[in-house]
Amino acid sequence: MQRHESGNTESNVVHPAELIVYSLLSNDLDGIYQSINDLRESQALLILMLRKIKNSLKEETQLLYDKSNWKDDNERLDSLRKRVDSLKSRFQSLKLRSDKLEQRE
């Protein structure tokens, strides 16, 4: 409680210095709370973005290293290799025949 010049006690009177200190502190605290809230929001957004990137990389890795997707392609490639080898051997045999025929003439 504070006494006024008249000597009356009033419990509702607040000293101006107290008001100034309270005002300064509350403004600073409001600013700090706002900054903390802004940081939390940006942190939440960053976490969401990182999760999206992580999931995207995970899917890409699965596609790159999943050998079951390559199975059909590998089988087709093996089949084509066999055909090419067969054609090469046929070509060699035809070339030998052609060379023999040329030598006879």
UniProtKB/Swiss-Prot annotation:
It is found in: Endosome. Pfam families: Snapin_Pallidin (PF14712). Residues 70-105 form a coiled coil. The keyword Transmembrane does not apply. GO terms for cellular component: endosome. Transmembrane segments: none annotated. Component of the biogenesis of lysosome-related organelles complex-1 (BLOC-1), a complex involved in endosomal cargo sorting. This is Biogenesis of lysosome-related organelles complex 1 subunit SNN1.
